[in-house]
Regions:
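A short, conserved, highly charged catalytic patch centered on acidic carboxylates
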Residues: 1-92, 99-100, 108-113, 117-179
Length: 179
């Protein structure tokens, strides 16, 4: 992260790639597969050069709201309309501005929001700060585990176009010790 200035690379792209790697690992570890029409439970918004931070926050907020609306419109969500245990996922958003990572959430539960409800600010981390590498990584992993748990809850309800792979999906034929 701190080498981005030496390498003349934008930190947003590096951070986005690493977040996606963490999420891919969590999905693989949980043996999750996705339909073509599956609804992601997270959004990543790297800051654009020349764009204001407020516009980035608004864009991420709109993306999270669009995911929640897409989930609400999903026909499979209405199958359990009379069920009190209907699952409304919490969508997680990552806003990346330079070395700063901001985590936001938005609930798909219509009881938790109104038309003017915005995403909730969870936390902000300076990934370029010396001595905070372990703590920042831990915070990111905890957030990714929350995303994974949300996906697993959707699998249990048969929602969101996510399902669990049958059998062993490890490429080398080994068995997964976690299962």
């Amino acid at each position: 992260m701190r080498d981005c200035s030496i390498l003349k690379k934008r930190p947003e792209l590096l951070i986005e790639r690493e977040i996606k790697r963490y999420i891919r690992w969590a999905v693989f570890d949980a043996h999750l597969l996705f339909n073509r029409d599956s609804i992601p439970v997270y959004a990543i918004h790297p800051h654009r050069v020349g764009d204001s931070i407020i516009n980035g926050v608004k864009r991420l907020d709109n993306r999270l709201k669009a995911l929640a609306a897409r989930y609400s419109d999903d026909s499979s969500a209405h199958l359990y309309a009379d069920d009190d245990s209907l699952l409304y996922p919490v969508f997680t958003g990552f806003l990346i501005c330079g070395p700063i990572l901001t985590i936001m959430t938005y609930s798909a539960d219509p009881r938790d929001r109104t038309e003017t409800t915005d995403s909730n600010f969870i936390s902000q981390f300076d990934l370029g700060e010396w001595g905070q590498d372990v703590w920042n990584s831990l915070a990111l992993v905890i957030t990714v585990m929350h995303i994974r748990r949300t996906m697993l809850q959707l699998v249990e309800k048969g929602l969101g176009g996510i399902y669990r792979a049958e059998g062993n999906i490890l490429s080398n034929g080994d068995t997964d010790e976690d299962l």
